[in-house]
């Protein structure tokens, strides 16, 4: 039998893409998490805490193949069934809205917590990001989409982003073009993958091989290039005037943009009508927020009206999730240096009362021990008995 010798380095090693968060960053992340949840509460969103793992039968239902691939799966030792560790909290809130609430009208939910990815979304991403987000159930009107996009911009402001930049699209545009061309499910999936990669050369070759009608082929060729400022909507409107579903989607984007730009004049709105992220479960607008120096979205969301259908309660729904961990890595929320008050504890009741009063005010009071190092404890003040009264003075 081969004996494996473990070194200290082996015991310290974490799985690839899994990280620990040390105090300075942890405090910054938790501070932003609290600010976001307070923001969502102020807008009427109720916090929920979904379980970290569920049966895959419910966790992955209606969420699309991309979430399935991201989900880490294990066998439940009690039931023998397959469990999934959540890779996305949205399907969980959809189940909760359908099963755990008795609200017939609008239901606003928010959350914050870890998700776990079986593989990183990109080479620099963590597999254990911390997300915060909202879900708005029961409202199909444009007003709900406006509220959600507005709240995303508010979230970016709270996070301290120097620029507010959002990409907007609508999956209904590609869906209408695909239906008009009579694509099979397999063809729709093939072109979806090419469009997602913006593989222009391959798109031209695929269209030539699969779309015999010149008019319909032109729509597929045009789609990847429909990206830019709000003028893109007018360009698309002239090209797809014969497709009512596309015009409806463009009207929806135009009206949403008008309100959002009036509310947040400094925000940059970029329209990508070939954006099909989440195509398999999203049904309307799709959006993502980007930050300088980071090539992947720091937040994303959209409308997904049919996700609750599999739980027996189809409800309109829209929402987003913010990647708090990514924001921390980018340095926008900054690390919090915490100062503290040192004290040599004795049995004086007056001293204990002073310590309790300081802690009640939010001060960090640390008892000195023989092994304690003031520099490591980050103490910059001390509690001393002066003139018969315990007072906080600068550390000598």
UniProtKB/Swiss-Prot annotation:
The keyword Cytoplasm applies. It comes from the Bacteria. The keyword Ribosomal protein does not apply. One of its GO terms (cellular component) is cytoplasm. It holds the Pfam family tRNA-synt_His. GO terms for biological process: histidyl-tRNA aminoacylation; L-histidine biosynthetic process. Keywords: Amino-acid biosynthesis, Cytoplasm, Histidine biosynthesis. CDD domains: HisRS-like_core. Signal peptide: none annotated. One of its GO terms (molecular function) is histidine-tRNA ligase activity. Pathway: Amino-acid biosynthesis; L-histidine biosynthesis; L-histidine from 5-phospho-alpha-D-ribose 1-diphosphate: step 1/9. It is found in: Cytoplasm. Heteromultimer composed of HisG and HisZ subunits. Belongs to the class-II aminoacyl-tRNA synthetase family. HisZ subfamily. Required for the first step of histidine biosynthesis. May allow the feedback regulation of ATP phosphoribosyltransferase activity by histidine. This function is generally fulfilled by the C-terminal part of HisG, which is missing in some bacteria such as this one. This is ATP phosphoribosyltransferase regulatory subunit. It comes from Cellvibrio japonicus (strain Ueda107).
């Amino acid at each position: 039998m081969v004996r494996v010798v473990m070194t200290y380095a082996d015991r310290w090693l974490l799985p690839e893409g899994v990280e620990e968060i040390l105090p300075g960053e942890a405090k910054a992340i938790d501070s932003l998490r609290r600010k976001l949840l307070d923001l969502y509460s102020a807008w009427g969103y109720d916090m929920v805490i979904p379980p970290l793992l569920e049966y895959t039968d419910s966790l992955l239902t209606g969420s699309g193949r991309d979430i399935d691939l991201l989900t880490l799966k294990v066998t439940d030792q009690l039931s023998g069934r397959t469990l999934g560790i959540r890779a996305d909290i949205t399907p969980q809130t959809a189940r909760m809205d359908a099963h755990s609430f008795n609200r017939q009208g609008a239901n606003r939910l928010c959350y914050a917590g870890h998700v776990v990815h079986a593989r990183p979304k990109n080479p620099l991403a963590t597999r254990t990001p911390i997300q915060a987000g909202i879900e708005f159930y029961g409202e199909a009107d444009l007003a709900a989409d406006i509220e959600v996009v507005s709240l995303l911009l508010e979230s970016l402001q709270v996070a301290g982003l120097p620029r507010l930049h959002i990409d907007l699209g609508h999956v209904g545009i590609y869906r209408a073009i695909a239906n008009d061309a009579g694509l099979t499910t397999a063809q729709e999936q093939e072109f979806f993958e090419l469009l997602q990669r913006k593989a222009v050369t391959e798109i031209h070759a695929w269209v030539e091989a699969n779309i015999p009608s010149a008019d319909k082929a032109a729509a597929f060729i045009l789609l990847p290039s429909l990206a830019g400022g709000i003028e893109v909507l007018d360009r698309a409107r002239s090209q797809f005037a014969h497709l009512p579903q596309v015009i409806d989607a463009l009207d929806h984007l135009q009206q949403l943009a008008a309100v959002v730009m009036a509310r947040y004049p400094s925000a940059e709105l970029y329209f990508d009508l070939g954006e099909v992220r989440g195509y398999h479960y999203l049904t309307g607008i799709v959006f993502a927020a980007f930050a300088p120096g980071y090539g992947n979205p720091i937040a994303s969301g959209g409308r997904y009206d049919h996700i609750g259908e599999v739980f027996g309660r189809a409800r309109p729904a829209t929402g987003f999730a913010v990647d708090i961990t990514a924001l921390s890595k980018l340095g926008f929320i900054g690390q919090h240096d915490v100062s503290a008050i040192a004290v040599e504890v004795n049995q004086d009741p007056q001293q204990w009362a002073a310590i309790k009063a300081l802690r009640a005010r939010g001060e960090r009071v640390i008892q000195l021990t023989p092994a304690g190092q003031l520099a490591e404890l980050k103490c910059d003040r001390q509690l001393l008995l002066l003139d018969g009264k315990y007072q906080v003075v600068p550390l000598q």
